[in-house]
Amino acid sequence: MPFIISRVNCPVSREQEVELKARMGKTIELVPGKSEEYLLLGFEDNCRLWLRGDDSDPIAYIEANIFGNEGHFGYDAFTAEVTMMFHEVLGIAPENVYINYTDIPDWGAGGRNFDRNRFR
């Protein structure tokens, strides 16, 4: 189950959020074995983000927490697509979109724990 949270320093309308959600649901399929069916998303707008000593340009910091993909398959294509998505929907310049990937070794959901070692 991926959990992707984005933080941007600009406002995000409901329509923009819904568009990002829909596109992210398709884009996660670039990572093998992942789909919108198990995708958890979070959107935080109007964050206080600074880049190169300046906060006047739109910036996106995105955390992609992904379970069971320690080989990082699909991350190049995912990065390219997410970067363009935030540019097209929110007008954030591609050079101001940053994505941090975190491997999730254990994930608890629905009262159960999932350990990636069980899936090898």
Where on the chain are the PLM-derived regions?
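Interaction-mediating elements
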Residues: 1-120
